[in-house]
Amino acid sequence: MIQTETRLKVADNSGAKIVYCIKVLGGSRRRYATVGDVIVVSVKEAIPNSKVKKGDVLKAVIVRTKKEIKRPDGSYIRFDENSAVLISGNNEPLGTRIFGPVARELRAKRFMKIVSLAPEVL
């Protein structure tokens, strides 16, 4: 469960390290976002000479959350960290690599490029 002001790690090689959630997209009073949801973020930490700079405002899709996700078969999945992948306006990732596993829920939300780049889909 990601809400406004949550800090997340970045799971791609776009150059950002830490991002800060500004807004959860999808409804005027939507409070929480989970895996597969799109949020608006601000870059808080970035490596030098990268595609993104500190202070940039971008969209990101959540790929891992500490809060468990219930699956339709009754099982749960949770990760050790909250992570996101930065995306462009047409839902394509800004980076060319994804680090760490991603949840299977991204496939249902039509983020096929992120699923194909990920080393593992859980």
UniProtKB/Swiss-Prot annotation:
GO terms for molecular function: large ribosomal subunit rRNA binding; structural constituent of ribosome. PROSITE patterns: RIBOSOMAL_L14. SMART domains: Ribosomal_L14. It comes from the Bacteria. One of its GO terms (biological process) is translation. The keyword Transmembrane does not apply. Signal peptide: none annotated. Keywords: Ribonucleoprotein, Ribosomal protein, RNA-binding, rRNA-binding. The keyword Calcium does not apply. InterPro entries: Ribosomal_uL14, Ribosomal_uL14_bac-type, Ribosomal_uL14_CS, Ribosomal_uL14_sf. Pfam families: Ribosomal_L14. Part of the 50S ribosomal subunit. Forms a cluster with proteins L3 and L19. In the 70S ribosome, L14 and L19 interact and together make contacts with the 16S rRNA in bridges B5 and B8. Belongs to the universal ribosomal protein uL14 family. This is Large ribosomal subunit protein uL14. It comes from Desulfosudis oleivorans (strain DSM 6200 / JCM 39069 / Hxd3) (Desulfococcus oleovorans). The gene is rplN.
